[in-house]
Amino acid sequence: MANGAQNASGTPAPAASRSGGHVVSARATTIGLMAILLWSFMAGTVRIVSENFGATLGSALIYTVGGILLLMFRRPAPIREFPKKYLIIGGLLFVFYESSISLSLGLASTDASSVEVSLVNYLWPTMMVLLSAGVSHRKHAVVKVLPGAIVATAGVVLTVGGNSGLDWHAAVQHIAANPLPYALAFAGALAWSVYAVFTPAMSHGVDGTSLFFPCVAVALWIIHFASGQGWPAEPPSLVAWLFVLIAAAAIGGGYACWGYGILHGSMERLAIASYATPVLSTGASAVLLGLALSLPFWCGALLVAVGSVLNYLVSARK
């Protein structure tokens, strides 16, 4: 067909069925949304693992186990089937994002700085929404999604920062005194949004998640050994190892679902839904760690919902 596919009755297939150069599958979009639910357990489980194994060793163990699980249950295609452009650019972006987030949290000097760095990292849903709008070829798409993006981003700040007692004056001082973790978190957020929006078109439908994930594990082991940190003084308990497995399954499973979703589902829908990631993550962490959810959290969650609905309405109005 020269200009668009036709269905059995000869009627042209609707343009809305295509996104990012592929035919959108509702099933794939749903699978992509499952990633957001799985990732909600990431922060809490990683925190528990880090308390028992240390930050760098804990991350390396999680991604090693996650990589093994992916290779067992979702083996990657043979290397020769991967487009070289996707393999190089996609692989570098994936590994850089994961490594930069791990490093940025490790370099944060205080608990308050860790919260601030996490907030910078959570700019990726906003970046992803704006990039998705920018490549959609719809007139004034970026301007139209901007109000919803601003509202949702303000909600993320309230959800994550407000629930942790974020002090903006102190945050500015922390950035001035130790800018590297914040710069890494920002660069990582940008890298992940670029990966999600642009690499599906390079992949020709081949998902590299199961191949990229073990590469992250290698990078994290290098970071661990370079940091000079060794094994914990006391052997971690069986429960600690169980949380390594849970974190690995949640993170690895999340990336597997996300990879399938961005390749075959609706990028715009997934981008908008990704605003829920920090909200669900903060909520799940509070449950796992026995923390209370303050009023700013609920106000932020409401703003995220409002901003997401605004962007959904814009995207639905083709």
Where on the chain are the PLM-derived regions?
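Glycine-/small-residue-enriched transmembrane alpha-helix faces in small-molecule transporters
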Residues: 1-62, 149, 154-157, 165-201, ...
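C-terminal-most transmembrane helix of multi-pass membrane proteins
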Residues: 2-22, 59-63, 240, 274-318
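Hydrophobic transmembrane alpha-helices of multi-pass small-molecule transport proteins
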Residues: 64-65, 70, 89, 94, ...
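Specific transmembrane alpha-helical segments of multi-pass solute transporters/efflux pumps
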Residues: 38-45, 75-121, 158, 247-265
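Hydrophobic/aromatic residues within transmembrane alpha-helices
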Residues: 49, 58, 104, 134-137, ...
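Transmembrane alpha-helical segments that form core, pore/gating elements
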Residues: 43-44, 67-71, 125-134, 166-230, ...
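Specific alpha-helical transmembrane segments that line the substrate/conduction pathway
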Residues: 57-68, 103-139, 267-286
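Structural signature of hydrophobic alpha-helical transmembrane segments
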Residues: 48-65, 106-124, 174-189, 237-251, ...
